[in-house]
């Protein structure tokens, strides 16, 4: 089948993205296999003030949510703008990828991606200051994500 014809039958919302967890314990093939079977989603671009209840309210519209793990700043132990949403079934997770990715939550456009499965310790930000790496180098002022970036100089 031609690549154009394949694109017509592809469900780009459900396809596995190019992103790979650099801290995954295993090889790329093993990670790819887990992602294709996963029922867990990574959710990014959340406000630091978004609650677990708000996440549940939105994501439960796509199916039965098993659990939500809010991402925490590893130093302050406060929310740092991401979470994991685990569903009971792959089908429900696929529905969330189709219908929730790119929507607004707490006045922010959120993004979802497949996750190979939550492991203890992954709920913490990986940035040097304890939060997410992307927030350390952000140059714009974003009050919903802690103001200015932590590493860049402020005006």
UniProtKB/Swiss-Prot annotation:
PROSITE patterns: RRM
Membership in a protein family: Belongs to the RRM NCBP2 family.
Quaternary structure and partners: Component of the nuclear cap-binding complex (CBC), a heterodimer composed of ncbp1/cbp80 and ncbp2/cbp20 that interacts with m7GpppG-capped RNA.
InterPro entries associated with the record: NCBP2, NCBP2_RRM, Nucleotide-bd_a/b_plait_sf, RBD_domain_sf, RRM_dom
Hydrolase recorded as keyword: no
Localization per record: Nucleus; Cytoplasm
Binding site for mRNA: 19, 42, 111-115, 122-126, 132-133
PANTHER family attached to this UniProt entry: 20 KD NUCLEAR CAP BINDING PROTEIN, NUCLEAR CAP-BINDING PROTEIN SUBUNIT 2
Region (Disordered): 122-155
Disulphide-bonded residues: none
Bias type Basic and acidic residues, positions: 133-143
Physiological role: Component of the cap-binding complex (CBC), which binds co-transcriptionally to the 5' cap of pre-mRNAs and is involved in various processes such as pre-mRNA splicing, translation regulation, nonsense-mediated mRNA decay, RNA-mediated gene silencing (RNAi) by microRNAs (miRNAs) and mRNA export. The CBC complex is involved in mRNA export from the nucleus, leading to the recruitment of the mRNA export machinery to the 5' end of mRNA and to mRNA export in a 5' to 3' direction through the nuclear pore.
Listed name of the protein: Nuclear cap-binding protein subunit 2
Keywords: Cytoplasm, mRNA processing, mRNA splicing, mRNA transport, Nonsense-mediated mRNA decay, Nucleus, RNA-binding, RNA-mediated gene silencing, Translation regulation, Transport
Annotated GO MF terms: mRNA binding; RNA 7-methylguanosine cap binding; snRNA binding
Record-annotated RRM domain positions: 39-117
Signal peptide: none
GO CC annotation, single: nucleus
Nucleus in keyword set: yes
Biological process, per Gene Ontology: mRNA cis splicing, via spliceosome; mRNA transport; nuclear-transcribed mRNA catabolic process, nonsense-mediated decay; positive regulation of RNA export from nucleus; regulation of translation; regulatory ncRNA-mediated gene silencing; RNA splicing; snRNA export from nucleus
């Amino acid at each position: 089948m031609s690549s154009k014809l394949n694109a017509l039958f592809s469900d780009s919302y459900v396809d596995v993205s190019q992103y790979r967890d650099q801290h995954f314990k295993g090889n790329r093939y093993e990670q790819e296999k887990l992602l294709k079977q996963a029922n867990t989603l990574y959710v990014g671009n959340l406000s630091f003030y978004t609650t677990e209840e708000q996440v549940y309210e939105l994501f439960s519209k796509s199916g039965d949510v098993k659990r939500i793990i809010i991402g925490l700043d590893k130093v302050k132990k406060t929310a740092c703008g991401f979470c994991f949403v685990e569903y009971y079934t792959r089908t429900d997770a696929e529905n969330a990828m189709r219908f929730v990715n790119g929507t607004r939550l707490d006045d922010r456009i959120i993004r979802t991606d497949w996750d190979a499965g939550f492991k203890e310790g992954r709920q913490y930000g990986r940035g040097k200051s304890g939060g997410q790496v992307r927030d350390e180098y952000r140059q714009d002022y974003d009050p919903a994500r802690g103001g200015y970036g932590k590493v860049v100089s402020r005006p």
